[in-house]
Amino acid sequence: RYTLRLLTLQQFQRATALICAMEVLRRAEPEVWGDAPFTIGLWVGQRVTPNTTDESHAAIEKERDGKYGTGSTSAQLTRCPWCGSEIAPGRELKVDRDLGRTFVYCGDKYGRCEFSQAKSKNLGLPVLVVDDEIYRHPPSMLIATVDKFAMMAWRGQVRALFGKANRECPRHGLLWPEADCNGNHTKKGSLEAVKVKEITPIRPPDLIIQDEFHLISGPLGT
């Protein structure tokens, strides 16, 4: 399992550079490529990435205090895939608990990178590494371990990745019956008042690839 998870992480780091290139092109011509950002998600076990935004926030706070543990963390990138600048977990990772989002920024201290806080304050690098955030904002490309797919039988929110969502909150993304979002939201700080809306089922994944299948053994492989 360790070998498979390490391989998955390396694939994520390499593929993020591709998604960054796509997002740079989209931002340059939104009238051609649309307003929705291209994003990539990392969907692996709880020991690697957080399940919830609260868990992500707690892990980042520990890292800011210099307490690097062995638990899950949102710091899956050590350098910006676009420009190579260092990414410090305590400085370049931020959690917006009102939006329920974890943002990862490029560490370029001069603010020249397209994904630095100076140029991309509202999004940062187009990555999603927290399970709940992946369900609410399904990424353009998702890299996962096969055991996460096996959770579909008892985790209803996973269905959102396959288009099974009928409501959307402009602030929090797609909703499922057990979602924490309680519906409409009043204005809060810089956040505008929003209303939850009914939506038609979204498009499920066009392609699913099972890589390195020979590494899976036991009941899960069967």
Indicate residue ranges for each PLM-predicted region:
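Short secondary-structure boundary/capping segments
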Residues: 14-19, 55-61, 156-161, 222
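Short, glycine/acidic-rich hinge or "gate" loops at secondary-structure transitions
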Residues: 25-37
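Conserved Walker A/P-loop ATP-binding site and its immediately adjacent core
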Residues: 1-23, 41-48, 144-154
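Conserved motor-coupling elements within RecA-like helicase/translocase cores
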Residues: 133-138
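Structured core elements
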Residues: 1, 39-43, 79-82, 105, ...
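SF2 helicase catalytic motif II
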Residues: 139, 147, 161-183, 198-222
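Cys/His-rich short segments
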Residues: 50-131, 162-197
